Design a protein with these regions (language model features):
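Alpha-helix exit/C-cap motif
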Residues: 36-59, 87-88
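N-terminal single-pass transmembrane signal-anchor helix
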Residues: 1-23
């Protein structure tokens, strides 16, 4: 009887561990196909043009440039800027848009993530260009922070959590008490 209970315990442990591995793989796939794809588009645009993607809100790449992402950009504008220099924008996902993705959290809650390019300040540095992600569930933010920065504090490195529009950097909240943060930002190097 004891042997049977031990075997059942091992099987249950393997199932639980398997679910964790599957969730981790889903999070890495979302990071690579969504956030990393836009970061790569930003870097490729800069390497090809010497300019910041989204520095102007005109689709034909004309207009005044100041080295900061314009905060009133549309997805169509970003995609047009990429195509104007021969670059393909990231592929649309299941939502039909390259700027939104859906994520199912471990508790079953569905989230819609939306990215935009912004110039922001969070009180710790001068303005910086970033990819801002709205609708970020805490568990996914922690996973992305770990993937990008190899730590998960939300306040350091290039992937951060913020408390509000222009708000300060914050530590990732406890997943069991706070399911989402206002926004997460991937700080771009230039």
């Amino acid at each position: 009887m004891a042997i049977v209970l031990i075997i059942i315990g091992i099987i249950i442990g393997a199932v639980v561990k398997g679910k964790d591995l599957i969730r981790s793989a889903e999070q890495k796939k979302l990071y690579n196909q969504f956030l990393s794809a836009w970061e790569l588009a930003y870097v490729n645009y800069y390497e090809r043009t010497g300019r910041i993607l989204g520095d102007t809100n005109t689709p034909d790449n004309s207009g005044t440039r100041d080295g900061r992402c314009a905060n009133d950009l549309t997805l169509a504008n970003l995609e047009a800027q990429l195509r104007a220099v021969g670059l393909d924008p990231p592929a649309p996902g299941p939502t039909g848009s390259s700027a939104t993705r859906r994520y199912s959290a471990s508790n079953g809650t569905q989230y819609t993530l939306t990215i935009s390019f912004r110039s922001r300040s969070d009180g710790t540095a001068s303005n910086y260009n970033c990819i801002e992600i709205l609708g970020m569930p805490t568990e996914l933010g922690i996973a992305f922070d770990r993937i990008k920065d190899e730590e998960m504090d939300g306040t350091a490195g290039s992937f951060i959590a913020v408390s509000g529009n222009g708000g300060p950097r914050i530590a990732w909240p406890n997943v069991t008490t706070s399911q989402t943060v206002f926004a997460a930002r991937l700080i771009l190097g230039f």
